């Protein structure tokens, strides 16, 4: 049924025609409608299954209303604010007295009671004045109405609960069968940061099997949380008193960073990127010229020196690379010019938004900027896409990648940096943005947007993706105002998608900084910039690697590659010999010659996740061998020289899997 088309006659309710309980709405001319709606004319309606993306969104939105209904039943003084659908679930914010995790079960029980009653959910349209009267006791809803409703809007009623909403929703609460409340958090009200709201998170699925699978994955995700693994492996320190949001790496965490840095450096050199360095601080004039001052000022660290000079700690690396590029003139034969840098940037995030390595206030990007001609875009993109695939194959092995192409919204060119041609005098305005643009020659406002640069560049991106056999999704209107981009996501071991790489075209910076080259006819042409970060940032890729591998990183990335354990003090000398030989051959090794038992030594080192535990006793000492134990607990005996060769090969080839 959900994949078919249903003919509905004028005056019929969709709910009366479509009996499939897995259908939660209908789509007519690409617009979603409630099943309780009545057809205003004879229509062909597409049933929307609860198992579809649209259907799941509707289910979760309805579950958010069910949550608000339950909370206001149990806590009559609670004032609901908003309850949107988010990735993997929903939340609802309330102005209410504080509650704890122990209260979730009570709220969930009330939700189940309302669900079992199968209360009809009805859409009603009210004029603005009536809406203000209905929600007069809730200042949060009043603010939403005043800001967003001009004449009229809809509410959804289920029993005694009414909520301001555009919908659509499921026909009745009985459709919301598989749901779970997850946790409670605090949230700052966006219109008054002094006011803290109670945020309750939950999730909902079409059936119990999918819900159980998700909850199991959620538990696995908690076990794999990189913050937990970082503490267990002693990789970094997060000191909220001295450096809130700024990770401090131990020798073990820095080892992982250095390996990632070294690998990216080798890939950059292989692909023609020059390694550069730029300072962490610039005068604010460069940030004003680049546009970061206007756009990112609330998130920048700014300061003024006693002599009056104002400076900003860099939130991005691109202006520094532009400053290097601008030092000389270029011919068309000189391009492309590629600069790369492991550049640390600093962005102020609110304390509630900072978390681990995925949302720090300081992070290091594997940042690169290519300066090239328009006709070179396609080849450069192909090279970068190849680099992306090569890098992630090394880091993750055989992993699923997804590619998103964000392009311009052609119906709203005013939101982007485009060229305009004056219809009155023919003058061409390069790189303008906005609705009120005036021709500098004749002062006419009758301007024709010229999207040819965008179209040319976007087509080269499409061609690059297609020529490499890469499937991608295209998102109109999602491009940055200064150019289209490609985002790359990876799927980890438990099925989560993470965005890592970004390849971003930029028509804005070259205009702002006057970046040109001399073309084959001796004339000046505008340079095109490409911003690229393959890892995204070293912090983010490290976090994802730790969670993907549950801390059991490939040997080349593992801080402790071998851990040598003598079975008694009689073999300490041989154990030291093994340990020193491993180090001499470039293998990161540690040794435990304490008086603890072998089992206790192994138990103590287990959280650090060494690649191999080397146990030595009389047999190994007599034969100059080692017994190596891998992470799965499997043991194998090698001669010392053979084991060194095996591990060195595993490290040098950056293998994902262990030797045995």
From Swiss-Prot:
Which Gene Ontology CC terms are recorded?
cytoplasm
Catalytic class of the enzyme: ligase
Q: Catalysed reaction(s)?
A: tRNA(Thr) + L-threonine + ATP = L-threonyl-tRNA(Thr) + AMP + diphosphate + H(+)
Signal peptide interval: none
Q: Which cofactor does it need?
A: Zn(2+)
Q: Does the keyword tRNA-binding apply?
A: yes
Q: How is the cofactor bound?
A: Binds 1 zinc ion per subunit.
Listed EC numbers: 6.1.1.3
Cellular localization per UniProt: Cytoplasm
Binding of Zn(2+) occurs at 318, 369, 531
Query: Which parts of the sequence belong to the TGS domain?
Result: 1-49
The answer to whether UniProt assigns keyword Aminoacyl-tRNA synthetase to this entry is: yes
Q: Which PROSITE patterns match?
A: AA_TRNA_LIGASE_II (PS50862), TGS (PS51880)
Among InterPro entries, the record links this protein to: aa-tRNA-synt_IIb (IPR002314), aa-tRNA-synth_II (IPR006195), aa-tRNA-synth_II/BPL/LPL (IPR045864), Anticodon-bd (IPR004154), Anticodon-bd_dom_sf (IPR036621), TGS (IPR004095), Thr-tRNA-ligase_IIa (IPR002320), Thr/Ala-tRNA-synth_IIc_edit (IPR018163)
Q: Which Pfam families match?
A: HGTP_anticodon, tRNA-synt_2b, tRNA_SAD
One GO term (biological process): threonyl-tRNA aminoacylation
Q: Where are the transmembrane segments?
A: none
Keyword entries, A-Z: Aminoacyl-tRNA synthetase, ATP-binding, Cytoplasm, Ligase, Metal-binding, Nucleotide-binding, Protein biosynthesis, RNA-binding, tRNA-binding, Zinc
GO molecular function terms listed in the Swiss-Prot or TrEMBL record:
aminoacyl-tRNA deacylase activity; ATP binding; metal ion binding; threonine-tRNA ligase activity; tRNA binding
Annotated region (Catalytic) at 225-554
What family does this belong to? Belongs to the class-II aminoacyl-tRNA synthetase family.
Which PANTHER family does the entry mention?
Answer: THREONINE--TRNA LIGASE, CHLOROPLASTIC_MITOCHONDRIAL 2, THREONINE-TRNA LIGASE
How this chain assembles, per its entry, is: Homodimer.
What HAMAP family does the database record attribute to this sequence?
Answer: Thr_tRNA_synth
Protein task:
Catalyzes the attachment of threonine to tRNA(Thr) in a two-step reaction: L-threonine is first activated by ATP to form Thr-AMP and then transferred to the acceptor end of tRNA(Thr).
Put simply, this protein is called Threonine--tRNA ligase
Q: Which organism is it from?
A: Thermoplasma acidophilum (strain ATCC 25905 / DSM 1728 / JCM 9062 / NBRC 15155 / AMRC-C165)
Classification from the root reads: Archaea, Methanobacteriati, Thermoplasmatota, Thermoplasmata, Thermoplasmatales
Gene name of the record: thrS
